[in-house]
Amino acid sequence: MTSHQVSGVYPVRLLLLLILLLTGLATGCQTGMGQSVQSDPSSDNAVEAIPSPILPNELDQVASFRELIDQAESIKAFERQPLVDRYVAMLPDAPIMSEDVAVFIWRGGASSVQLVGDMNSWDMENAPQFDKLEGTDLWYLETVYEEDARLDYMFVIDEDDWRLDPLNPRTILGGFGPNSELLMPGYKIPGELLPTSGSIAAGKLETHTLESSHLGQNRTIFVYEPAGQLVGAKTPSIYINDGGDFLNLIGATTILDRLIAEREIPPVVAVFVPPINRGLEYALNEDYASFMADELVPFVQQTYNTDPDPARTAIMGYSLGGLEALFTAITRHEVFGLIAGQSGAYSVGEDAVIKRVQRASRAYQTGGSSRQELRMYFVVGTYETAVAGDSIDGSILGANRRLADVLETTKYDYLYEERPEGHSLGLWKGTFGTALRYLYNPEYE
C-alpha cells in the first residue's frame, strides 16, 4: 500500500517540474526575442540600436547622401557616428555629385568649415558655411553648378586654416600652390590631356638669351622645336607670354607633342617668353610689342626657319598676357596674324585694346592700306566676375563679352567661348589645345 502511494506521487512531481521548466523557457525566449532592449548611453555596456546603413549609390550619390542625413536625423545623436563611418568608408569619390549638384564633405573637429574657390572668387566674405551633423564629425555643404563646370576650391577650417579636400584625390596647381579640383559629371577632359597607350615623339626645348634694345635688358627665351619637322620646310610659329607658366604649370610642350603626333595641328615652333616685370610689360606696352615683333621674331625666323607669313605666326597669353598678346597683334599686324587670348584682362585702360580692335576692323572692312586679316580665339570663364585688376566693372567676363560684341560686328575669323570655370590654370591648360587647333587647322570650328 505504502509502496503504491510513493510511486504515484513521483509522476505528479515530475509533471509539475516539467511544466515549470517549459514555462521558464517560454518566458526567457519572449524576453530575449520579442522585447527590445533600451540602450543607456551612460552605461559602459549599452548596445546601440543601429539601423541598416545607407550606402553610396553609384547611380545617384546625392540621393543616397540625402537619405543618410534623413536616417541619421531620425535616430538619437549618439547613434549617428557608425552610420557616417560606414557611408564614408564606401564612398567611391568626393565631392558627391549627381547632374548639377555637388556635396562637399569634411570630417574632423572644427567650429566652422567654409568653401572658397572659383565659385566665389576666393572671397572669404562670400564663402558659404558647412552644416554639421550633430553627434558626428561630419560637415557637409550642398551646392549647385553647371553640369559641365570645372572649378578650383579649398576648405577653410575655423576661418584661417586653408586645406585641400582630403577626400578628393584631384588637385591642380594654382598661383599659390595646389588646389582641389571639382569636375562636374558633364565635364569632358580634353583628349590631349588623357593618358595615351602609345609612345609620342617629343620635341626638343632650347634656351636662348637675347639682348633687347627696346627693353634695355637681356631676355631669356625657350624655343620648342617639334619632332617630325620637314627638312627645309618653313614652319608656323607661336609666341607665348607667361612662357614659364606655360612650360612648368600647363605642360605646353607635352600638349604640343600630342597634337602634332596625332596630326591635329602641323608641326609648330613654340617660343616661350617669361616676363621680368609682368605688370609693366603686359599693360599695353609698346616697347614690349616692338621687342616681340622687331627683335624676337626675326631671331626665331633666322634660327629655326619659321614662316614669316603673318597668317602662320601666332601670339597668345592668359589674363594680362592675353591683353598684351591682343595689343601686340593689333598694333603689329604685319607680323602676327593669329591671336589667342585666355581670360584676357581687356578692360585695362578703359577698354583701350577693345577700341583698337574696333578701329582695326573698320580698316579691314573698308580695304584701306592698314587692312589686316586676323584669325582669333578667345575663351573666358563664366565665374571670372571679380578678378583683381579688371578696372571697369571688376569682371574679366564682362570685358570679354564687350570684346565679343565688337567682334560680332567685324568680318574677322574668330571663335569666342565661355566655359563654366574660373580664373585658373585649369581653364588655360584645358583650352590650350583648342586654341592651337583653331589657329592652325582652318577646318576646326
Name each region found by the language model.
Residues L25-G28:
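C-terminal motif of bacterial Sec signal peptides marking the signal peptidase cleavage site
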Residues G244-E295:
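Active-site machinery of serine-nucleophile hydrolases
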Residues F222-E225, G232-G244:
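Short beta-strand element of the alpha/beta-hydrolase
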Residues V379, T385, S395-E445:
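C-terminal catalytic histidine-bearing segment of alpha/beta-hydrolase fold enzymes
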Residues G251, Q302, D309-R371:
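Primarily recognizes the serine-hydrolase "nucleophile elbow" in alpha/beta-hydrolase
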Residues P95-D148, D158-Y187:
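Aromatic-rich carbohydrate-binding modules that target alpha-glucans
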Residues Q229-A233, L280-S319:
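Gly/Ser-rich "nucleophile elbow"/oxyanion-hole loop immediately N-terminal to the catalytic nucleophile
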Residues Q30-G32:
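Bacterial signal peptide processing site
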